[in-house]
Amino acid sequence: MTTFNGNTVTLAGKKLQVGDTAPDFSLTDTDLSKKTLADFAGQKKVISVVPSIDTGVCDAQTRRFNQELSDADNTVVITVSVDLPFAQARWCGAAGLNDAITLSDYYDYSFGKAYGLLINELHLLGRAVFVLDEDNKITYLEYLDEMTNHPNYDAALAAVK
C-alpha cells in the first residue's frame, strides 16, 4: 500500500527491480531543453524522485544527495519532479545549488509512468531513489510506501560507492 499524508494513493506504471535496465526518459531541464539518459552516458546516476521540490522532505532530500555526492567521481545526481522548470530553477538558486540537475516530468508524466511512480490521484510523482551504474543498470532502488517519509540516505549513498 502506498500513502501520501496517510491517505491511500495508487501509482501508475510497473515498479522496477534491481538488475533492470532503467527506462530511457525525456525530461525538461530548467532551460526548457530536453534531457535523456544518453546525456549522462558513462556516469553513475542517482535519480532522486520527489513529489515537489518546494516541500520540506523534498528540499532536504535534494540538498542531501547533492551535497554528499558533489565530489563523487563519475557520478551525477538527477532530481526529478513534476514541478515546472521555472520553479525548479528558482529553488536551485534560493538553495545555493546552482549546479544541481533538476528535471521536470510535467509535460506528459512519461517518466512517472515508466518508473511506476505517477500518483494517479494527485498527478505528482511518488518518492523514490534509483542508483544506476554506468550502463544504466539499477544497482539500488527504494520506493517509499509513505510519500512524506525520508528515503534511506545511508543505503543509497553506500550504493554509489
UniProtKB/Swiss-Prot annotation:
- Cite the EC number: 1.11.1.24
Task: Keyword check for Electron transport, yes or no.
Answer: no
Q: Please name the catalytic residues of this protein.
A: C58
Highest taxon of source: Bacteria
What catalytic reaction does the record list?
Answer: a hydroperoxide + [thioredoxin]-dithiol = an alcohol + [thioredoxin]-disulfide + H2O
S-S bridge residues: C58-C92
Which residues does the UniProt record annotate as the domain Thioredoxin?
16-161
Instruction: Please name the SUPFAM superfamilies in this protein's record.
Output: Thioredoxin-like
Molecular-function annotations in GO:
thioredoxin peroxidase activity
Which keywords label this protein?
A: Antioxidant, Disulfide bond, Oxidoreductase, Peroxidase, Redox-active center
User: Which Pfam family is one of this chain's hits?
Assistant: Redoxin
Family per similarity comment: Belongs to the peroxiredoxin family. Tpx subfamily.
Anything else the record notes? The active site is a conserved redox-active cysteine residue, the peroxidatic cysteine (C(P)), which makes the nucleophilic attack on the peroxide substrate. The peroxide oxidizes the C(P)-SH to cysteine sulfenic acid (C(P)-SOH), which then reacts with another cysteine residue, the resolving cysteine (C(R)), to form a disulfide bridge. The disulfide is subsequently reduced by an appropriate electron donor to complete the catalytic cycle. In this atypical 2-Cys peroxiredoxin, C(R) is present in the same subunit to form an intramolecular disulfide.
Q: What does this protein do?
A: Thiol-specific peroxidase that catalyzes the reduction of hydrogen peroxide and organic hydroperoxides to water and alcohols, respectively. Plays a role in cell protection against oxidative stress by detoxifying peroxides.
**Can you state the subunit structure given in the record?**
Homodimer.
Q: What is this protein called?
A: Thiol peroxidase
Q: Which organism is it from?
A: Streptococcus mutans serotype c (strain ATCC 700610 / UA159)
Q: What is the lineage of its organism?
A: Bacteria, Bacillati, Bacillota, Bacilli, Lactobacillales
